[in-house]
């Protein structure tokens, strides 16, 4: 008895996907509008597991979307706005062609617009979800805020991104939320902890832009359109959590200090934004909260739980100390250093910062202030040093933040070769190569003084070089003596055995030396034997996986040893060069 004939590609995975062209026709949108809608709604293409089945036997390259995603887009109200905008462009073009200027003005006044608020709420049901997805939004907004006012993107978008990023930086300063900073080739990486969520973003350096031609700025502008809406909501909620005014306002005392020099910098319409962007003044609060230290209740607990709580308490104390790293210090920035990045970092850790009044609005004190403790310079020998303050290069600020302590300033004086700038985002595991600079930093964090390590190493190298010849001779003599003694013992033992064999006597028990058992070595041997037996009892798949893991560990150890050898060779070359310079006649 025959069944119904089954047709190909009418069930299974072939019915779960749809090509981009079919989806676009279903929505009645052009390709740029379809792409824009997918970006705003967070709909992305999918790669089917069986592409040939989905493509109905064809092997042509096509982009596929899930049908349920396209059905989800059918009910989006923005689709109608896109259609209205298409009609608006057609009418506007016709009015321009007929030179009907009244109609042109009327159409521009009634230009269709839309909001993305409902999409933000739809994509991020909770505030924590929005914070977890804030990395890309911040990076894109910081990038657009540095763009010049060219035809690549709208001026309003650049100004909006600048305002939102300045607002977020002010929140980080007020909440003391900054944790890590790293200078890279791409830009400056920041990590802030906002409501327990780590947020990492990158801010480009303040260089002139050379716009590449192979970048689609329309796609970037669409992402930025969504990200600015998201960041606006996030900033509003974050400011509410700290009882700060939103839009942000500068405190009345700082406002009065800046009022004296306001007219010389900008117009009234621009001065408030310039003052906010200076990052040198605190923000006004709705209600100033009373600072009370909340003490945790103590309950009788087990020993293990108590140890965990003690570790947690120490971690919180270290974090609070890190937040007040620059508290009580006054910095002055020279005009050649990156002002905004340094001001943001110093203010995030409780320090006071200022600069020359002719450089930017927002300077709070002059370079002649007697309370200045550190002056950040990047050009040696440009000014007369003032007693009572340290002159350091900008890297000192970044390294102090990552080290979580105030580093010695001797290695950061103007004109001095700077130490390597280590990344705080790298955490070494067991078996990894740890550079000597990181070991020195770890020693400083433990409270040790690694200042004389290099001198001791150099002295040891010098002593080793002086006694190198004598040591080689002594080692050779010792080896000859040991070899001679071992040969004599073997000859005596062999001759005794030969005499017993020839005499026909039974082998006698010979007196030996008592050997003490090494318990630690026996325990290691038992452990290695148990491990070997456990490996023998493994299944084939488990043994293969174990061998892969051990191979990876051995490879990591080999790479670490190779790096250590390279570093040792480099240090030896540098030491020999220094030694040659010392011994060279003047």
Curated annotation (Swiss-Prot):
Record cross-link Glycyl lysine isopeptide (Lys-Gly) (interchain with G-Cter in SUMO2), residues: 515
Region (Sufficient for nucleolar localization): 1-257
SUPFAM superfamilies, A to Z: BRCT domain
Region of interest: Disordered: 447-508, 562-586
Entry GO MF terms: ribonucleoprotein complex binding; RNA binding
Location of region: Required for 28S ribosomal RNA processing: 1-54, 537-586
Primary location class: nucleus
Keyword Acetylation: yes
InterPro entries membership: BRCT_dom (IPR001357), BRCT_dom_sf (IPR036420), PES (IPR010613)
Alphabetical keyword list: Acetylation, Chromosome, Isopeptide bond, Nucleus, Ribosome biogenesis, rRNA processing, Ubl conjugation
Function in brief: Component of the PeBoW complex, which is required for maturation of 28S and 5.8S ribosomal RNAs and formation of the 60S ribosome.
Protein name as catalogued: Pescadillo homolog
Organism for this UniProt entry: Rattus norvegicus
């Amino acid at each position: 008895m025959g069944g119904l004939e089954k047709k190909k590609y009418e069930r299974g995975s072939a019915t779960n996907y749809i090509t981009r062209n079919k989806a676009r026709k279903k929505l009645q949108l052009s390709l740029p509008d379809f792409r824009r809608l997918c970006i705003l709604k967070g709909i992305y293409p999918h790669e089917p597991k069986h592409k040939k089945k989905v493509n109905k036997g064809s092997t042509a390259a096509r982009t596929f979307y899930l049908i349920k995603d396209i059905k989800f887009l059918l009910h989006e109200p923005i689709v109608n706005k896109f259609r209205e905008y298409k009609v608006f462009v057609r009418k506007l073009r016709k009015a321009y062609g007929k030179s009907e200027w009244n109609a042109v003005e009327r159409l521009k006044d009634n230009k269709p617009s839309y909001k993305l608020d409902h999409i933000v709420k739809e994509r991020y049901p909770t505030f924590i979800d929005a914070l977890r997805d804030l990395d890309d939004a911040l990076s894109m907004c910081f990038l657009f805020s540095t763009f010049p006012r060219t035809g690549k993107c709208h001026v309003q978008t650049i100004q909006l991104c600048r305002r939102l990023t300045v607002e977020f930086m002010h929140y980080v300063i007020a909440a003391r939320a900054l944790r890590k900073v790293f200078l890279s080739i791409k830009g400056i990486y920041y990590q802030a902890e906002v409501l327990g969520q780590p947020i990492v973003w990158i801010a480009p350096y303040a260089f002139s832009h050379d716009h590449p031609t192979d970048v689609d700025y329309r796609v970037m502008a669409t992402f930025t359109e969504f990200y600015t809406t998201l960041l606006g909501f996030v900033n509003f909620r974050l400011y509410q959590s700290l009882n700060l005014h939103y839009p942000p306002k500068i405190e009345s005392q700082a406002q009065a200090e800046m009022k004296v020099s306001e007219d010389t910098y900008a117009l009234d319409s621009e001065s408030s934004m310039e003052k906010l962007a200076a990052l040198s003044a605190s923000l006004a609060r709705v209600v100033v909260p009373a600072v009370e230290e909340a003490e945790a209740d103590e309950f009788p607990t087990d020993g293990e739980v108590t140890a965990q709580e003690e570790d947690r308490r120490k971690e919180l104390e270290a974090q609070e100390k890190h937040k007040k790293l620059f508290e009580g210090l006054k910095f002055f920035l020279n005009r050649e250093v990156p002002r905004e990045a340094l001001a943001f970092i110093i203010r995030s850790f409780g320090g006071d910062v200022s600069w020359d009044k002719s450089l930017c609005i927002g300077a709070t004190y002059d370079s002649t202030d007697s309370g200045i403790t550190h002056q950040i310079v990047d050009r040696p020998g440009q000014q007369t040093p003032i007693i009572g303050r340290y002159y350091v290069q900008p890297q000192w600020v970044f390294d102090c933040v990552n080290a979580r302590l105030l580093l010695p300033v001797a290695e950061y004086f103007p004109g001095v070769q700077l130490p390597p700038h280590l990344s705080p985002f790298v955490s070494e595991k067991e078996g990894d190569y740890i550079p000597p600079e990181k070991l020195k930093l770890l020693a400083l964090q433990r409270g040790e003084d690694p200042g004389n390590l290099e001198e001791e190493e150099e002295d040891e190298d010098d002593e080793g070089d002086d006694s190198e010849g004598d040591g080689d001779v002594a080692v050779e003599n010792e080896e000859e003596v040991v070899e001679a003694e071992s040969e004599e013992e073997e000859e005596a033992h062999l001759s005794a055995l030969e005499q017993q064999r020839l005499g026909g006597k039974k082998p006698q028990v010979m007196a030996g030396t008592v050997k003490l058992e090494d318990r630690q070595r026996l325990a290691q041997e038992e452990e290695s034997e148990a491990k070997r037996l456990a490996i023998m009892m493994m299944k084939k798949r488990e043994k293969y996986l174990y061998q892969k893991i051990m191979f990876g560990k051995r490879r990591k150890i080999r790479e670490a040893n190779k790096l250590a050898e390279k570093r040792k060779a480099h240090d030896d070359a540098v030491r020999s060069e220094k030694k040659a310079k010392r011994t060279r006649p003047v």
